[in-house]
């Protein structure tokens, strides 16, 4: 199964137009991001402690919900 990080990278963009693209760009720059994780709780805890680049955890929640629908539910 594709990790959340791998899924999120499809939203990277040199000129981000939305919060998820900003998140993807920042996660790419975050060398400690749990790149292999598929677990909501693990990612959420990491971002709460280290995700100062997120304007709101809602952005993560929305991205993870999309990931859950598109990848995990297959």
From Swiss-Prot:
- Gene3D superfamilies, per database record: YozE SAM-like
Q: TM segments? A: none
Q: Which domain of life is it from?
A: Bacteria
One of the Pfam families matching this protein, by short name: YozE_SAM_like
Write out the similarity annotation: Belongs to the UPF0346 family.
The name on file for this protein is: UPF0346 protein BPUM_1890
Which species is the source of this protein?
Bacillus pumilus (strain SAFR-032)
